[in-house]
From Swiss-Prot:
The lineage of its organism: Eukaryota, Sar, Alveolata, Ciliophora, Intramacronucleata. Its cofactor is Mg(2+). PANTHER family: TUBULIN. It comes from Stylonychia lemnae. This is Tubulin beta chain. Residues 429-442 have a biased composition (Acidic residues). GO terms for cellular component: cytoplasm; microtubule.
Length: 442
């Protein structure tokens, strides 16, 4: 079957990852010891996408956990599903990356990377037909961003034809954890543009907004935020794990969502977002889900899709519903809001339907959009980067680990190029294309 090897790196990546495994285990009826207690054969039918069956019928996640300090891993191990993971798959250093991308990518991380790759290789070899890798990490810190991108490039070298999907937490505009976030994020994006196949962008501020506004939580914790993220991640791979009428997998997603190779940064959304208490009071319909899914308030990254246009989008529905209705709704959205979709890619929404809804819901939908509005996010980080880099502030932390200023300049221009590419396609119309063709012919 089409297995996925999951890798989590750094504090953020490990916390999101741990939450993700709680959600997935719950969906497949697996308890914290790895024993199956489910009520439907469907839960086991394709359980091997994410789990390996060990002796005695235990299910062990195909997960690799890495960090440059032991702290977060200890808390994962002590957490509710800590005993689920294979002990050998925890790979950690002692020194920490201290929010320094260079430490994660060139010094501390580089020393640890081989032992991580060994574990990744072992997991990949245990697969029948490996579909690809998914990585959870943040771009603002040192380990997830620096070592995460190092791992991505190494895995890419070894498995060039497998899909590399990342769930990347981008520094948010108002909520900042470290001063050097813009540096770390820009250096990471520089890598992700080249080495990842699909990047789902998430940011804390957007998640906080969802918790405040929609879920009516007064004091959202990281646990609440991570729960939102894992709902999204589990939705993306739902079609691989449960039977459905219209299937999709990581590769199909890539083919349908990426019109130009560099533009593979997606906005993620999830519906229905209802506060934990009020779920049972309303039945959802496909039109309602569709409505909510395209709402800017539902996006898990702080870019407003109304400021750009969708190149492509993908809607992954879950639950019992008629495919005809799904298709009608999708067409309906495109026709009503045609100005928000580029007209030179007709029918640019892909939908898939999986029969099994998430726990506690009748139907749900995960949304991935490739919108030109995501350039706002890169612009924002880029401006902060430039402000500091112009004065060479904090640079000595990076050059001290052997980095060259040149690399910063390259990363900066790569990100600026990315922004202008998005802008170029946002402005492009079907008529322009004909003119461009004529110019090329001359």
């Amino acid at each position: 079957m089409r297995e996925i090897v999951h890798i989590q790196g750094g504090q953020c990546g490990n916390q999101i990852g741990a939450k993700f495994w709680e959600v997935i285990s719950d969906e497949h009826g697996i308890d914290p010891t790895g024993t199956y207690h489910g009520d439907s054969d469907l839960q086991l039918e394709r359980i091997n996408v994410y789990y390996n069956e060990a002796t005695g019928g235990r299910y062990v996640p195909r997960a690799v956990l890495m960090d440059l300090e032991p702290g977060t891993m200890d808390s994962v191990r002590a957490g509710p599903f800590g005993q689920l993971f294979r002990p050998d798959n925890f790979v950690f250093g002692q020194s920490g990356a201290g929010n320094n991308w260079a430490k994660g990518h060139y010094t501390e991380g580089a020393e640890l990377i081989d032992s991580v790759l060994d574990v990744v290789r072992k997991e990949a070899e245990g697969c029948d037909c490996l579909q690809g890798f998914q990585i959870t990490h943040s771009l603002g810190g040192g380990t997830g961003s620096g070592m995460g991108t190092l791992l991505i490039s190494k895995v890419r070298e070894e498995y060039p034809d497998r899909i590399m999907a990342t769930f990347s937490v981008v520094p948010s505009p108002k909520v900042s954890d470290t001063v050097v976030e813009p540096y770390n994020a820009t250096l990471s994006v520089h890598q992700l543009v080249e080495n990842a196949d699909e990047v789902m962008c998430i940011d804390n501020e957007a998640l906080y907004d969802i918790c405040f506004r929609t879920l009516k939580l007064t004091t959202p914790t990281y646990g609440d935020l991570n729960h939102l993220v894992s709902a999204g991640i589990s939705g993306v791979t739902c079609c691989l794990r449960f039977p459905g009428q219209l299937n999709s997998d990581l590769r199909k997603l890539a083919v349908n969502l990426i019109p130009f190779p560099r533009l593979h940064f997606f906005m993620t959304g999830f519906a229905p977002l209802t506060s934990r208490g009020s779920q049972q009071y309303r039945a959802l319909t496909v039109p309602e889900l569709t409505q909510q899914m395209f709402d800017a308030k539902n996006m898990m990254c702080a870019s407003d899709p109304r400021h750009g246009r969708y190149l492509t989008a993908s809607a992954l529905f879950r639950g019992r519903m008629s495919t005809k209705e799904v298709d009608e709704q999708m067409l309906n959205v495109q026709n009503k809001n045609s100005s928000y979709f580029v007209e030179w890619i007709p029918n640019n929404i892909k939908s898939s339907v999986c029969d099994i809804p998430p726990k506690g819901l009748k139907m749900a939908v995960t949304f991935l959009g490739n919108s030109t509005a995501i350039q706002e996010m890169f612009k924002r980080v880029g401006e902060q980067f430039t402000a500091m880099f112009r004065r060479k502030a904090f640079l000595h932390w990076y050059t001290g680990e052997g980095m060259d200023e040149m690399e910063f300049t390259e990363a900066e221009s790569n990100m600026n190029d990315l922004v202008s590419e998005y802008q170029q396609y946002q402005d492009a119309t079907a008529e322009d294309e004909e003119e461009m063709d004529e110019e090329q012919m001359e």
